Amino acid sequence: QSEAAATDGAALVEVTYEPLPVASTTGAALAPGAPLVRNPQELGGGGGHGAAVQSGPRNLPPNVSNRTSLKQGDIARGFEEAEVIVEDVFHLPMVYQGYLEPMACTVVPEVSGHLTVYASTQTMFDTRREVAQALGLKVSQVKVVLPFIGGGFGAKAVLLEPLCAALAVMTGSPVHLSFSRMEDLAAGNPM
């Protein structure tokens, strides 16, 4: 099998999309009744990096995955002593970490029903859990092999491995997926 055969096969695939409701801004996602943009059982983690981290309570609104506060010094005193106070709404651009190779993975289905996933990921245990959950497998049926990666900087987390694994199971053949740089950017990853 070759890339040309894969291209020919891909041309035969018919895809039907079901439009889902969208919350495309933070404000829209936080509004009452907003469509869910994440699984409510999934909590974010590691959002706060710093010496003084306080985690908030876990009774979070539906589209909030984590709440972390960083506190250092006396904020009231800081405002009292400030010569100038600027209040505004700030919008930050998307950040691309610029790792050496884009997202890539290969999934090899075994005769036993087990899968071996070779992934350029920073989260091998999350990847194993997500692949198993997506395919209804036991975690023990999924082996993740992590070769050296050319950087990730927090961006290489589970994204395409469950898709790649599903295709491998459906076809009964190894499946390799590697994004081009433009596909990596368009996939909404990283942050």
List each model region and its residues.
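Structural alpha/beta core scaffold segments of enzyme domains
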Residues: 1-191
